């Protein structure tokens, strides 16, 4: 498996499909969803990106061999395995059937109903009621089909289950309250089964079904609309009559709306207000994290990246932490343990700009442990500073390191280089993951 890079923006439900498929197949996939690797609305409009992906849409996949692919279902098909695609011609056709069903019959009404509740789209009562009826219809079809089945196709999870689950995700999280979903118990049973599979949880985290149907909030909608500044009117200086006539003829052409080429889920991202920067109060630091990441990615760790790190590290503006997974007795197969690490990294995408970590799995199947070294902006444990970052961190014990101590220097060297004695662990190195 050559692997590749998935370009997307954070929390893009369409990107969940290939990411979950990759969890099942073991396909090595790197997510690029934040600067400097990828910045939505900027990178995807560059000539270089459009040459590879003419529509400029995400998710988009680029293999290490230069192979490029767009459309989330196609990417999921590519990174998946034969079991996910269907092991017989009949099953393969049925998988395609449910993927098409999802795109054609679930996504449109789901968007029309859910987006207004998120403040992304203006509320229209008639459109919302039609969407509710459309969702009742598709849930009825699914409920009948799942009455005697555990999964949509065959006896195991396939791309059909992954695709339909992702399309229903925001419905279950936002509007399908208990009374609405009650007639469709088979669908809910199947949905809960899917989202609680380790491969799904590694990407989605814990999925909580909504308790009360979310409603349109006019105030929230108004707040999420991009503000347009009205230029102040100034009295023009007297001009010759001829010039005035020419100005009337040359009326300015309005600039096209930047959202015109976005689909609804991308408009959601564009309309989403920027979260408050938890580090806005901190003085500017001399340590440039992005520059260190470039050194770490492109240069030798021991001879270039580590010397650069210690030469430029700002101990007043940054802190180094050691983390150890609390429940090693629950770790079984190595690949499942790695899913815990990669899943946490994927859900912490919004922390990448101001964070770096090397997390390592030690040991073997049924006898392993997870620990890592993290670097954060400021002196506090980053996860507590923003709701966007409060993900999985409570499953670890955290200890702040003294950056001037020999212990810290040894841990940073061993964990960043993935080599050393690791005396604090007592198990051999298995594999590591980098958060950057």
Swiss-Prot record:
InterPro entries: EF-GSTs, EF1B_G_C, EF1B_G_C_sf, Glutathione-S-Trfase_C-like, Glutathione-S-Trfase_C_sf, Glutathione_S-Trfase, Glutathione_S-Trfase_N, GST_C. One of its GO terms (molecular function) is translation elongation factor activity. It comes from the Eukaryota. The keyword Phosphoprotein applies. Keywords: Elongation factor, Phosphoprotein, Protein biosynthesis. Residues 275-436 form the EF-1-gamma C-terminal domain. Pfam families: EF1G, GST_C, GST_N. One of its GO terms (cellular component) is nucleus. The keyword Phosphoprotein applies. Residues 221-278 are annotated as: Disordered. SMART domains: EF1G (SM01183). SUPFAM superfamilies: eEF1-gamma domain, GST C-terminal domain-like, Thioredoxin-like. Residues 2-87 form the GST N-terminal domain. Residues 88-221 form the GST C-terminal domain. Residues 221-249, 265-278 have a biased composition (Basic and acidic residues). GO terms for biological process: translational elongation. Phosphorylated by CDK1. EF-1 is composed of four subunits: alpha, beta, delta, and gamma. Probably plays a role in anchoring the complex to other cellular components. This is Elongation factor 1-gamma-A. The lineage of its organism: Eukaryota, Metazoa, Chordata, Craniata, Vertebrata. The gene is eef1g-a.
């Amino acid at each position: 498996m050559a692997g590749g890079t998935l370009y997307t923006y954070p929390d893009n439900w369409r990107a969940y499909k290939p990411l979950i498929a990759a969890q099942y197949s073991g396909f090595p996939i790197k997510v690029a969803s934040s600067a400097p690797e990828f910045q939505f609305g900027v990178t995807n409009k560059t000539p270089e990106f459009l040459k590879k992906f003419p529509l400029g849409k995400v998710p988009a996949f680029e293999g290490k061999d230069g192979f490029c692919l767009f459309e989330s279902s196609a990417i999921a098909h590519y990174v998946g395995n034969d079991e996910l695609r269907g092991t017989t011609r009949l099953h393969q056709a049925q998988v395609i059937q449910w993927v098409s069903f999802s795109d054609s019959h679930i996504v449109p009404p789901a968007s029309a109903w859910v987006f207004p509740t998120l403040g992304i789209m203006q509320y229209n009562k008639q459109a919302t009621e039609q969407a509710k009826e459309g969702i009742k219809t598709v849930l009825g079809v699914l409920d009948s089909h799942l009455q005697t089945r555990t999964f949509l196709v065959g006896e195991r999870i396939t791309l059909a289950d992954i695709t339909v689950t992702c399309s229903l995700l925001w419905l279950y999280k936002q509007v399908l309250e208990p009374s609405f979903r009650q007639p469709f118990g088979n669908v809910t049973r199947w949905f809960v089964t899917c989202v609680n599979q380790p491969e799904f949880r590694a990407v989605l985290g814990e999925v909580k079904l909504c308790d009360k149907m979310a409603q349109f909030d006019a105030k929230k909608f108004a707040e999420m609309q991009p503000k347009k500044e009205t230029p102040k009117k100034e009295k023009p200086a007297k001009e010759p009559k001829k010039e005035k006539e020419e100005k009337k003829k040359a009326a300015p052409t309005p600039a096209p709306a930047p959202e015109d080429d976005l689909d609804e889920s991308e408009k959601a991202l564009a309309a989403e207000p920027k979260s408050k920067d938890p580090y806005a109060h901190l003085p500017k630091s001399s340590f440039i994290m992005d520059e260190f990441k470039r050194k770490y990615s492109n240069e030798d760790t021991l001879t270039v990246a580590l010397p650069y790190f210690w030469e430029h590290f700002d101990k007043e503006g940054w802190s180094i932490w050691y983390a150890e997974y609390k429940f090693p007795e629950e770790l079984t197969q190595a690949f499942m343990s790695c899913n815990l690490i990669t899943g946490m990294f994927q859900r912490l995408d919004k922390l990448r700009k101001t964070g770096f970590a090397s997390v390592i799995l030690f040991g073997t199947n049924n006898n392993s442990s997870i620990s890592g070294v993290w670097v954060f902006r400021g002196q506090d444990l980053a996860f507590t500073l923003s709701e966007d970052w409060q993900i999985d961190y409570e499953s670890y014990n955290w200890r702040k390191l003294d950056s001037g101590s020999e212990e810290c220097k040894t841990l940073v060297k061993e964990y960043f280089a993935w080599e050393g004695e690791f005396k604090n662990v007592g198990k051999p190195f298995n594999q590591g993951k980098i958060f950057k």
